[in-house]
Amino acid sequence: AKDFENGKRVRFQKDAENPTAAGPDAEGISVDGNGMVYLASERDNSVKGVNYNTILMVNPNAEGDDLIALMEWNLTDSLPQVSANMGIESVEWISSVNVNGKLFDQNTNAAFDIANYPKATANGVFFVALEANGHVYAYVLNDDGTCVQITDIDSKIGGAMALDYDTYENVLWVVSDNGYNNRAAKIAFNGTADVDVVHVNAPSGVDVTANNEGFAIAEYTYTNDG
């Protein structure tokens, strides 16, 4: 893409004046409805031995090869304590249109309503996958830098490395790597804490011994004979 021929580097706000800083250990990426980009980072590479789960927001259209985070949300204390390299592996933004009345909100003990969160960033919910236990955690990221955990979903596949929301089937895909035979879980929100989960084995031809850690769904228009 134009201006991305050599890629762009994302940096923590604290490193804005220190271009030599190692920066975030970015593991996942998502884009909201306004085109802002969010990175999931499981540690600060300047302190590699410490787990530090954060989501960083950047404007991909900003000039320069370095993008300083416009906003940062630290999720570490709201997640299970894990080793440095077993933190969040993915982030997925889902519009409130797709989760209102469907996602269970543990704070209200009822179906989620974005109106209860007037400071919500990007009019949606951000889901992160934790490698250590395969759980998916949903958050509202507030525009003041705070965050609220909405729900905790166990994908029951052991580990989680990738997320992608299918807007056609209205399901959240959670995908594992070779440590769990590249199995996936399709999660459908039904307004209760007991979500609908369907497990999917890796398709034939996929090398389940390979360290596959990314996953994305094409639009339904790409389907052949399906």
For each predicted feature, which ranges?
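Sequence/structural signature of beta-propeller domains
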Residues: 1-226
